[in-house]
Amino acid sequence: EKFMAKESWDRAIPLLEEALRRKRKPCMIGMGAMTDPYIPLEEELCHTRQALELIEKYGFGATLITKSARVLRDLDLLKRINRQAKCVVQMTLTTYDEALCRKIEPGVSTTKERFEALKILRDAGIPTVVWLCPILPFVNDTEENINGILDDCAEAKVKGIICFGMGLTLREGNREYF
């Protein structure tokens, strides 16, 4: 409950600045491992943008993991960070099928919107990586789905694809669940 309190989030940016100011050596700052930095509320709060401004100010690099084309709002900052240190945007992709995407990933950018964002980031010189996960048995594990995503990754010229769970076994209980 305390974690979700607005006051906790209001202190996030000053705490980040204090931590960055004290670091002796710049490094890559990661965003998005626990929650997407571009949730819809970000449009109002702008915490991600403020964090990126601090990362730029103190000369750090950045890596972001997102499912949102909203990342393009901060393209100007991402380019500057990439020029002075390094910036990598990682985009999670689950399915090539737009209708399935809307069912299993409601409230996030569609696969098509994410691929368009990847191309814009590429054209801006920002390295991109795709997380191809999760692969769900009988949902998105078809050859057509995997090939569709891989073809789009090739077109977007992503620098890498991270994939895990392709060897999923259906132990007792899993088969019934899926």
Sequence positions of predicted segments:
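Conserved Radical SAM active-site core
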Residues: 1-90, 94-102, 115
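Short capping/connector residues at structural and topological boundaries
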Residues: 8, 43, 109, 140-141
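A short secondary-structure junction signal
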Residues: 43, 101-104, 141-144, 148
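Repeat-unit-sized solenoid/scaffold elements
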Residues: 54-65, 69, 104-105, 156-174
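Residue-level signature of transmembrane alpha-helix interfaces in integral membrane proteins
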Residues: 75, 79, 108, 149-150, ...
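Surface-exposed cleft-lining segments at the edges of enzyme active sites
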Residues: 99-107, 133-138
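Conserved C-terminal portion of the radical SAM core fold
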Residues: 112-173
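Acidic, Ser/Thr-rich peripheral helices and adjacent loops at domain boundaries
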Residues: 177-178
